[in-house]
Amino acid sequence: QTIIKQLNQNIDSYISYMDNIASVIAQSGDAYKYLYSEKGYGATKDENYSEYRQRLVEQFKTILKGRADIRNIGIVREDKNTPSLFDNGLSVRNTYVDLNTQPWYADAVGKYDRYNLTSSHVQNVIKGERPWVITLSRGICNYTGTEAEDGVVFLDLNYSAISELCAQSSMGDKGYVFILDQNGNIVYHPQQQQLYNELQTENISLVMNAESDIVTAESGDDEKIYALSRSKTTGWTIVG
């Protein structure tokens, strides 16, 4: 139980650090001016607009250079014809993706008081890319006086970043750690592929409905003891 609680604290600290990065971008004058400027998409010849973009690109590049665990950084709006910006400024939006079907976007847009955090998923908002990531996102407030409020900043965190944190928590020869989000979706599991292929199972409903920090699942001769730690910061449940 102590190991699980410590891991929970480590993950909370990690996610809070990443949210600090997202918050700096979300509150940046360059970000909201770039996304919401009335000149918008056709303003690339405007001197100030080009400066907003260049400063954002340099900021993104600096972050990516210092954090190998961040796969992508981007700011985007719902409309495919409005500005977006990813990574080093060369990546292009995948126009076939409806952002309203993407939880990292739909659950963050218009919300400025806290971040949104997804379970592990395939990120396909950038053309030609399909990395397996966990996405942290925030709404970007519009201070330009126009009515649009659909901008979002997102950080795609490499799945390996969370798996490495979990791997550092030794649970003995047969023990292991996995993570569920607030809806019971799997964020991380060491045998995630086997779970998707139904070659392995976990009693997720038992875990999600547990009223104590330790629950026992029995299945024939097999008995599993789950130790739980729920995070008020991320909404995730760490299970070992």
Language-model segments: residues:
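Short, hydrophobic-rich beta-strand element in sensory/regulatory alpha-beta domains
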Residues: 22, 71-75, 175-178
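Amphipathic coiled-coil signal-relay and dimerization helices
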Residues: 33-35, 81-89, 184-190, 227-229
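Amphipathic alpha-helical bundle/coiled-coil segments
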Residues: 12, 98-102, 156, 181, ...
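Juxtamembrane extracytoplasmic/periplasmic/luminal helical "stalk" adjacent to the first N-terminal
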Residues: 1-41, 66
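Short, hydrophobic beta-strand elements of compact beta-sandwich sensory domains
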Residues: 136-139, 144, 149-159, 220-240
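Solvent-exposed, extracytoplasmic
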Residues: 53-64, 151-194
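Extracellular/periplasmic juxtamembrane segments that couple receptor/chemosensory ectodomains to their
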Residues: 183, 192-240
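Extracytoplasmic/periplasmic ligand-binding sensor regions of membrane-associated signaling proteins
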Residues: 65-72, 79-157
